[in-house]
A protein has these predicted regions:
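Structured loop/turn residues at beta-strand edges in well-structured enzyme cores
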Residues: 17, 64, 87
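Short acidic loop-to-helix transition motifs that present clustered carboxylates
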Residues: 27-28, 52-54, 99
Length: 122
């Protein structure tokens, strides 16, 4: 409940149209499959310092939803990476350095916001 109040306050402050829904912890596999079912047309990305930079126009215009997976401090496990590959997740770099989770989430949000702005401008 506390986190939902924080999400509501943040959404109001940033004048967001939608309110994010928060849920309790799940296994990585369960969470990824749940997101895939809920958003079947979403582009699935994961943070990877060796991944590609997002290029404006590189994705289909009808795919406007994003699922972003940010790994733990030590990186994704081999099993998690295998699952991401099976699900056709794209490794994406948002910074030339490895970021902490708090910073990575903000960086991904900023990069995707800019990406959508540049794609819409085309």
């Amino acid at each position: 409940e506390r986190w939902q109040k924080i999400a509501l306050a943040a959404a109001k402050q940033s004048e967001r149209v939608y309110l994010p829904t928060l849920s309790g912890p799940e296994s990585f596999e369960s969470a990824v499959h749940c997101f895939r079912q809920t958003y079947p047309n979403a582009t699935l990305l994961y943070g990877d310092p060796e991944g590609q930079w997002l290029e404006p126009g590189a994705h289909s215009p009808e795919r406007r939803d994003w699922i972003v997976c940010i790994g733990p401090e030590g990186g994704f496990s081999k099993e998690e990476l295998a699952l991401l590959r099976v699900l056709n997740a794209q490794p994406v770099r948002v910074n030339p350095h490895i970021l902490r989770i708090e910073t990575a989430a903000v960086a991904f949000t900023a990069v995707l916001s800019l990406y959508e702005h540049l794609t819409d401008a085309r």
